[in-house]
A protein has these predicted regions:
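Short acidic/polar active-site loop segments enriched in Thr and Asp
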Residues: 16, 78, 293
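N-terminal basic/disordered segments at the start of proteins
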Residues: 2-32
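A short acidic Gly-Thr/Ser loop motif
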Residues: 12-17, 144-150, 211-215, 300-302
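Generic beta-strand structural signal
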Residues: 13, 25, 146, 155-156
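Helical "lid/coupling" subdomains associated with nucleotide-phosphate turnover
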Residues: 3-8, 22, 46-70, 74, ...
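N-terminal glycine-rich anion-binding loops that anchor highly charged ligand groups
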Residues: 29-42, 69, 75
Length: 311
């Protein structure tokens, strides 16, 4: 009798959130999702300014990860991979964080601990996950993974990792609530300058694909959803003009007003205004350099790329 294939788990810890995906091999689907969870822990709080991880942020992350480990144990996970992205790449005291992850993840798989992955590997894993459900004839794809500290762009095997994300821009430029016009202009100038290195990638793209929380939240808002519904968000296609109408309205609101909307995660309400500036500049670049007019939103991303590599 053939033994059942092991259940696998992926954990992605970024600047703003830590997320879990548990999957098992399925004859029909290849990989069947058992659970997907998301917690806003703001691990990268202050890293852009201090160069160090805040001990309170590490503790918030530890508590969330311990909860994920309980879920993995309950579901019988045998293999886990945890990746840590922008915030830990930048931190002088990153070893405090890694020691914590080794202690917590070791309860599931001895020897497991978070890995810092390069921006290029992050982009490749995101690309594999984000494009899994899109018809191949819509390629070449440009996948944009907009995070808290960095944003990755990938077209095929070419990738660019940029030092701009919704937390980084909020802390560096957009500190008022709501942000002032001068703050927004400064953030926009930084994003526009950063995107110069991305322009050569975008020229060949036929479909723009957006993944991660800023894009998925903007999809829910653009569609006017009453609650966050992954099934309606995944593979939704947003016209640039509809999207930018929402982003400009978001920046006029306070964080508390954004938080009152049921589709906006409370932990994202204070940084999505900065995320909206990044989205607007990406949209302008995609329109100018590739003649595109819409973006496909994917609920699948780096987590799906990781579990595919484990199964």
């Amino acid at each position: 009798m053939t033994a059942a294939a092991p259940r696998v788990a992926a954990v992605d810890c970024g600047t703003n959130s830590i997320r879990l995906l548990v999957s098992e091999p399925s004859p029909e689907k290849g990989l069947a999702e058992l659970t997907k969870q998301n917690s806003i822990v703001r691990l990268g709080q202050g890293v852009d300014e201090t160069g160090r991880l805040n001990p309170e942020a590490i503790e918030r992350t530890r508590k969330a990860l311990a909860g994920y480990v309980e879920t993995m144990q309950r579901l019988g996970v045998e293999k886990v991979r945890m990746v840590a992205t922008s915030a830990t790449r930048d931190a002088a005291n990153k070893e405090d964080f890694f020691s914590m992850t080794a202690e917590v993840l070791g309860r599931v798989q001895p020897g497991a601990r978070a890995e810092v992955i390069s921006g290029e590997e992050e982009a490749a894993l995101s690309f594999a996950g984000a494009t899994a459900d899109i018809e191949p004839d819509r390629g070449p794809f440009c996948v944009v993974d907009l995070g808290g500290g960095s944003t990755e762009f990938v077209v095929g095997k070419q990738a660019v990792s940029t030092q701009m994300g919704c937390v980084r821009l909020t802390e560096r430029f957009m500190r008022s609530d709501p942000p002032t016009a001068a703050e927004t202009d400064a953030a926009r100038a930084y994003v526009r300058d950063t995107l110069r290195q991305v322009a050569p990638l975008l020229v060949s793209a036929r479909t723009l694909v957006g993944c991660a929380g800023t894009f998925t939240t903007l999809s829910a808002l653009t569609q006017g959803l009453d609650s966050y519904d992954p099934a309606r968000i995944h593979m939704s296609e947003l016209l640039f003009d509809d999207l930018t109408a929402i982003t400009s309205a978001l920046r006029a609101q306070t964080a508390e007003q954004r938080r009152a909307n049921p589709v906006v995660h409370p932990g994202r309400a204070d940084v999505i205004a900065a995320g909206s500036v990044i989205v607007e500049e990406i949209v302008d670049l995609a329109r100018e350099s590739a003649g595109l007019g819409s973006v496909v939103i994917s609920e699948k991303d780096i987590l799906d790329g990781i579990v595919a590599g484990l199964a």
